[in-house]
Amino acid sequence: MHVSLRPLEDGDLDAIYEQGTDPESIRMAAFIPPNWTDRAAFLARMSRLRADPSVSNRVIDVDGAIAGTIASFRIDDQLEVTYWVDRAQWGKGIATEALRMLLAETAERPVHARAASDNVGSLRVLEKAGFRRVGVDRGFAGGRGEEIEETILRLD
């Protein structure tokens, strides 16, 4: 299995949209916009993100197929990372490898991340990449329709 990162292209949008509509993936991602599965809203959101020079949005490619996306972006002048892996690819080390590759592209530290506190898989990915837990917060999770706890992590 060969994992690589590449720039997101127009032709990737259909596959990325379809991966993003999986109900279990939405539940685990938790902190997503309320209109996440609306195709027009998805295309508008992707257009905004792709036009923003502070966002590095990449496709996770596994053996020539789209396995998900990974991005770095800024919130309140802090560098954060996020990723989404197609549920059919969970548990194969793809997110861990993609995150290590993305982190190798920047020397900037600290890097921040957040995950639903019950998303054990995502927390494991972040910790394998060297992130450590630095706090918890509560917030409304659009993917669950309720307020839940999220874990805040940092890589120094």
Question: Which residues fall in each region the model found?
Answer:
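Acyl-donor (CoA/ACP) binding surface of acyl/acetyltransferases
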Residues: 1-24, 57-156
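Conserved GNAT-fold acetyl-CoA-binding loop/helix
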Residues: 24-46
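A short, aromatic/hydrophobic, helix- or strand-capping loop or linear motif
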Residues: 28-33, 55-61
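Short loop/turn motifs at secondary-structure junctions and domain boundaries
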Residues: 48-53
